[in-house]
Amino acid sequence: MSATLGFLGLGSMGAGMASRLLETGHDVLVWNRSKDAVAELVAKGAREAATPAEALAAEVSFSMLSNDAAVEAVLTADALAGATGRTHVLMASISPALADRLGPVFTEAGVGYVGAPVLGRPPVAAAGQLNILAAGPAEALAAVEPYLAALGKQTWHLGETPSVANAVKAAVNYNIIHALQAIGESVAMTERLGVDPALFTELLSSTLFGGVVYTGYGKLIAEQNYKPAAFTAELGAKDLGLAAQVAAATGVTPATLPALQHVFEVVLADADLGPDADWSAIAEVSRRNLG
């Protein structure tokens, strides 16, 4: 089924997802603040939308914007005014609180709203192999399901409230952060006993801890290879903050949260690592006794 789709936000993830929609035969209207990213997609067959409103007026539109501030600046009532009867899929990892505030904005504009943050890195997005965490009204989900199937290997249906998808994404990332910290602490201990970090992380990933976090990030930690980042420490700190918001909203007091907040603060302030290091660089706090 071919359709005209809008896509707003062409960072590394958004560009990969928009490319995937093009590859699956769709007409894609793209918008981004940086025109270089737009030009790359146009060269692949996309069409440029002059404004966010033009992209949002497509039959189904998607956004993959960088943070809450960017989402609030782009997905305004004015921009949605011409999208009545359409459906929007918000795929950014935003705060559940913002997702809830946006609900009435979409409703008043007559636009269906699906929250659908994703699990996966840019190459996974480009290959259409994402895990998609989707929540929204049944009618809106049905309208976008074929396109989500093109973008991901599995769509996880999480109910009718879009913000729940964002809360679940924050909870998943909270687990990833714990894994990164656990790898760092255990590598620090075994390395000081003379065990090769590469051997130790291979032991972890090939026995009890298979999966992309231990295999992929374990290798980065073993090699102390944190730049260029696949996902920056600055973004990791943002996602940890989102998890803290979810915990507060649900009345949970996580015992480990203060320690994780501390290691991110140390990495962000470190002259060698800093905010542009990969988020797995939190492993260095234990290895180097930074904190």
Kindly give the residue locations of the regions a language model identified.
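Hydrophobic residues within alpha-helices
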Residues: 17-18, 37, 102, 147, ...
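Rossmann-fold dinucleotide-binding core
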Residues: 5, 93-173
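Rossmann-fold NAD(P) dinucleotide-binding segment
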Residues: 52-111
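Hydrophobic beta-strand scaffold residues
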Residues: 28, 48, 112-114, 155, ...
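Helical "substrate-binding/catalytic lid" subdomain
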Residues: 164-286
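NAD(P)+-binding Rossmann beta1-loop-alpha1 motif at the extreme N-terminus of oxidoreductases
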Residues: 1-64, 86, 122, 154
